Curated annotation (Swiss-Prot):
Keywords: Cell membrane, Heme biosynthesis, Membrane, Transferase, Transmembrane, Transmembrane helix. The keyword Transmembrane helix applies. GO terms for molecular function: protoheme IX farnesyltransferase activity. Converts heme B (protoheme IX) to heme O by substitution of the vinyl group on carbon 2 of heme B porphyrin ring with a hydroxyethyl farnesyl side group. It holds the Pfam family UbiA. This is Protoheme IX farnesyltransferase 1. It catalyses: heme b + (2E,6E)-farnesyl diphosphate + H2O = Fe(II)-heme o + diphosphate. It comes from Pyrobaculum aerophilum (strain ATCC 51768 / DSM 7523 / JCM 9630 / CIP 104966 / NBRC 100827 / IM2).
């Protein structure tokens, strides 16, 4: 059972589920039956797409020290079982998205699945370093789906807020990929840190990381408010400080500190948005 749970990538999808909840609460929703329906749909659809990613990438996972112990390369789950599991979860989540949430939220559920499972995993990841920019729209979709459920529509503030997720993803993934760039080279996956010189990679990733933090701060000043501002300030300060530190030091240790210190900023921002509406 634990192997099947790990296929869902719980350490990843919880943030996407939080984004859908933040979208719903920020859009005017409350703690009601629709919220619980949204939680179920978000869990099934994001978990299903994560499990499909495990299935599709089982060959490259076997070549990487970070992933070779995952259930498929280690033989704990067969490819056919993983595929059936992922498609069952995905189909259930997407179907319930339309049935329980409605047409527009259901459409965002479908788009989120397609951007991650198809655009990122199948089409782009092994072909171009731009893969992360295609898959990143899955993050926009989960927030917008929750917002559309509450509001009945999507407006400019919602779109702008959703891009906080989109901008956070590249620096977060690339900072992790920087540490394991040897793995990506060995597996033939064109992640940016595995393609360019280390110093240039550090400069690019730390700059994007700081820019994402500045954008999150601007968003909260424009559209947030209340006690949650302290959470945002904490996340922004930690992210910008460690980004500058990484840019100056240009070492793997400094990059890892930046990765660890800046990882919580998106969750803090989403929680602050929720608090601003409670």
């Amino acid at each position: 059972m634990s192997s099947y749970i790990s296929l869902l990538k719980p350490r990843v999808i919880w943030l996407l589920i939080l984004a859908s909840v933040a979208g719903y609460i920020y859009g005017g929703g409350g703690v009601d039956s629709r919220l619980f329906s949204l939680l179920a749909v978000a869990f099934l659809s994001t978990g299903g797409s994560a499990a499909f990613n495990h299935y599709w990438e089982r060959d490259i996972d076997a070549l990487m020290t970070r992933t070779f112990k995952r259930p498929l390369p280690s033989g704990l789950i067969t490819p056919n079982a993983a595929l059936a599991y992922s498609l069952a979860l995905s189909a259930t989540g997407i179907s319930l998205g339309f049935l329980l949430l409605g047409l527009l939220p259901g459409l965002f559920v479908l788009l989120g699945w397609l951007f991650y499972a198809v655009v990122y995993t199948i089409v782009l990841k092994r072909r171009t370093w731009l893969n992360i920019f295609g898959g990143g729209f899955a993050g926009n979709a989960v927030f917008l789906g929750g917002y559309a459920l509450a509001k009945g529509t999507v407006d400019l503030p919602a779109v702008l807020i959703s891009f906080a997720i989109y901008l956070w993803i590249p620096s977060h993934i690339w900072a992790l990929a920087f540490k394991y760039r040897g793995d990506y080279k060995r597996a033939g996956v064109p992640m940016l840190p595995a393609l360019i010189k280390e110093e240039r990679a550090v400069a690019v990733i730390s700059a994007i990381n700081a820019a994402a933090a500045a954008y999150i701060l601007w968003l909260y000043l424009q559209f947030g408010g209340g006690a949650g501002g302290a959470l945002v300030a904490l996340g922004v300060a930690a992210t910008i400080a460690t980004s500058i530190y990484a840019a100056v030091k240009k070492t793997e240790e400094a990059m890892w500190k930046m990765y660890k210190a800046s990882s919580p900023i998106l969750a803090l921002f989403l929680i602050a948005l929720i608090l601003s509406r409670l």
